[in-house]
């Protein structure tokens, strides 16, 4: 199979085995690249392009072609829905890669009817050299084994 894809959901758990109650080995976040190695029941065996983790994910929404222009620069960027930009309960995690489809005042649309605040994103090429500030933003965060969220 070995096709490259990009995650189109906020995040998904990568499981050690192709079953619901399996341990989590890692996570994929929005815009992250992965390859599908094989399919087993309702699961895909995948390998992440960035850190080379492999494991199983349920069938998910993904892009075949994706050219990210920006990334999330805060721990959790709230997702807003529709033209009224209604707050949702979902977030995109830190370093999720997105492509700006549209701009409207202080918001950008990254997916049909899904918006983020402009101040929460930065160009993909921008490097943040203030490591102390980055580290402090992770203080008091709950630890999740294998987690990126």
Ranges and model annotations:
Residues 1-18, 27-30, 37-40, 47-50, ...:
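SH3-family beta-barrel domains
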Residues 132-149:
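Catalytic cores of peptidoglycan-degrading enzymes
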Residues 22, 51-54, 114-117:
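Short, surface-exposed beta-strand-loop junctions and turns on beta-sheet-rich folds
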Residues 9, 116, 138:
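Residue-level signal for pocket-adjacent positions within structured domains
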Residues 95-96, 117, 129-130, 136:
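Glycine- and small hydrophobic-enriched segments that form the cores of compact globular domains
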Residues 12, 54, 141-143:
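Flexible, active-site-adjacent loop/turn segments at secondary-structure boundaries
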């Amino acid at each position: 199979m070995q096709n490259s894809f990009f995650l189109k959901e906020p995040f998904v758990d990568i499981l050690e085995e192709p079953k619901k109650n399996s341990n989590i080995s890692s996570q994929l976040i929005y815009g992250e690249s992965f390859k599908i190695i094989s399919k087993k029941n309702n699961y895909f065996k995948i390998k992440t392009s960035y850190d080379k983790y492999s494991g199983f994910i349920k069938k998910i929404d993904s892009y075949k072609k994706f050219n990210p222009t920006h990334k999330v620069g805060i721990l959790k960027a709230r997702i807003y829905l529709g033209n009224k930009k209604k707050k949702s309960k979902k977030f995109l995690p830190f370093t999720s890669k997105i492509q700006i489809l549209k701009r409207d005042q202080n918001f950008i649309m990254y997916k049909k009817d899904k918006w983020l605040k402009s101040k929460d994103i930065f160009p993909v090429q921008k490097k943040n050299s203030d490591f102390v500030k980055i580290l402090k933003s992770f203080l008091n965060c709950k630890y999740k084994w294998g987690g990126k969220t």
